[in-house]
Amino acid sequence: LIYVQEGCCQLDQRWEESSSLYSRLNIGGENGFLCMVKEIETEWDQHLPHWAFDAARQRTEQDLQAYLADMPALAPAYQQMGHMAGYLNWSSIVRPDGFLKREAMYMSKNWMTNVWSWDHCFNALAMSKGHPALAWDASIIMADHQDVSGRLPDSISDQHVIWNYCKPPIHGWTLRRLMETLPLSPAQMEEAYRFLSRWTQWWMRYRRRDGLYYYNHGND
């Protein structure tokens, strides 16, 4: 739902058979405009909240600054790059919803809007020194959808769990690195052990021939 609180908004769209060739929103107003996009999964609740743009922007800026403040300090030469990296990580965090049982970090919110079953390890390492809870969730998130065989899905999102491929088993290495900085509890260590055991056994049972491990596809 696109709700125009101030100004005007006009939809310009051209349809061909079952889909649109393009969709354009022409927005404007004599004194500016303010429109909101509200995601609706089933039925509209008939609620149109009033938003103050400056206040919403301030809350978002405060959330970003709080995230950055907990990241490790960098030398002056690297601060601009570190700020951009922190912003990209922060902006890719999404709330639990649908198939996502915990907070997750997508690869981006541009077009790689998934969590892939090895990229998430690098996300966990990136957050381990400033955001231990997010780092733990990022490292263990694939366990939420681990198959009974031990296999991990190729990727997950709020809407999909995809099994087309598998990814390199770097999760044990990642856990070892995380243990250097994260104060993992006995319960977390037990959860990680069960996860890694099933994952390792899957490789030994289903991806080994003549003593060598193999991939079925280049995307693996």
PLM feature spans:
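Acidic/polar, glycine-enriched structural segments that form the non-catalytic walls/loops
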Residues: 1-113, 186, 193-205
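Substrate-binding groove/exosite segments of carbohydrate-active enzymes
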Residues: 68-176, 180-181, 189, 197, ...
